[in-house]
Amino acid sequence: MEQTWRWYGPNDPVSLDDVRQAGATGVVTALHHIPNGEVWSVEEIEKRKALLAEKGLTWSVVESVPVHEEIKTQTGNYQRHIDNYKQSLRNLAACGIDTVCYNFMPVLDWTRTDLEFQLPDGSKALRFDQIAFAAFELHILKRPGAAEDYSAEEQTQAKSYFDAMGEAEVTKLTANIIAGLPGAEEGYTLDQFRARLAEYDGIDKATLREHMAHFLREIVPVAEACGLRLAVHPDDPPRPILGLPRIVSTVEDMQWLKEVVDSVYNGFTMCTGSYGVRADNDLVAMIERFGDRIHFTHLRATCREANPKSFHEGAHLQGDVDMFAVVKAILTEESRRQQAGDMRLIPMRPDHGHQMLDDLKKKTNPGYSAIGRLKGLAEVRGVELAIKRVYFPQMK
């Protein structure tokens, strides 16, 4: 696997020197300063590449070229945004970049309710609390029809949770959910958020699939023509939220995506933390089934809680993800490719490290502090080395 590191650009508190010292050789980044829907010019791409090259690093994966909301709803200037997306892909390929991660989550990117969940050892993790989220939906956002998505017991618990909240806690929970986490390109006020949700009235899972199918039928031929691998990121969490459909959550969704445009360039990001939140997602079986389509991996572990819809980020080698089995499955696919003549390594990045040690005293991007990811990368690197020595001695 190619060891990579997500970097949010020049304003990231983690420097490129830090990235090199962590042992990563590739960087996963994006041009966050370019508005959604606009073309990424060759000049801007080359500028970012040069910045990385100065530190001896390569731009291994784009994460992400954002998919404009109008593409997802098929409204407004959606076709122009698709045309711009295609041009961005061509420009990236012309600059030698061959892997692009993207997602098709409506309105929100990845979602958490607590960005400072304290673990027993004093480190901090990200958490999604189903009851806190219900309290937000039912009593802060007051989304029409939200009660239908929660059991009577969850509604009772959510009311108690909300009643115990002070004004500052309401503000913090709201910001955690709608203000935009790292990598999300848009944040909202409550009124803006309600308006954005309303744009999806009448859009169910089947309709969103139709919209994604149109998008893929437009962009995959372009990616194929210029040798650029697309890797869709799963929904996080992997289920419908806020009354919105989600269509990249299960093995059935992956099969649909594979078939809708049957090209190896129409591929997946295997995010073990996102898919792994669902107990019915067999990660190893998914890797084995869709191995030739897996172009990028996010390796992390989550811990499901008493309410199975609640979870927090675990240590990389703990939690509900069998990291040994996952890494072995990825290396099996990598070995298969090498035997077929494809010597490219599958890019991997350690995802969502705990905030720990000296980073507890620093301003960090939630989930993306340096030391927690350094620890995760070192642990996964060790697992990879051991598996290679025992099972794949021919691999470098």
Curated annotation (Swiss-Prot):
<dbReference type="GO" id="GO:0042840">
    <property type="term" value="P:D-glucuronate catabolic process"/>
</dbReference>
<keyword id="KW-0408">Iron</keyword>
<comment type="function">
    <text>Catalyzes the dehydration of D-mannonate.</text>
</comment>
<comment type="similarity">
    <text>Belongs to the mannonate dehydratase family.</text>
</comment>
<dbReference type="GO" id="GO:0008198">
    <property type="term" value="F:ferrous iron binding"/>
</dbReference>
<dbReference type="GO" id="GO:0030145">
    <property type="term" value="F:manganese ion binding"/>
</dbReference>
<dbReference type="Pfam" id="PF03786">
    <property type="entry name" value="UxuA"/>
</dbReference>
<dbReference type="InterPro" id="IPR004628">
    <property type="entry name" value="Man_deHydtase"/>
</dbReference>
<keyword id="KW-0464">Manganese</keyword>
<protein>
    <recommendedName>
        <fullName>Mannonate dehydratase</fullName>
        <ecNumber>4.2.1.8</ecNumber>
    </recommendedName>
</protein>
<comment type="pathway">
    <text>Carbohydrate metabolism; pentose and glucuronate interconversion.</text>
</comment>
<keyword id="KW-0456">Lyase</keyword>
<dbReference type="InterPro" id="IPR036237">
    <property type="entry name" value="Xyl_isomerase-like_sf"/>
</dbReference>
<dbReference type="GO" id="GO:0008927">
    <property type="term" value="F:mannonate dehydratase activity"/>
</dbReference>
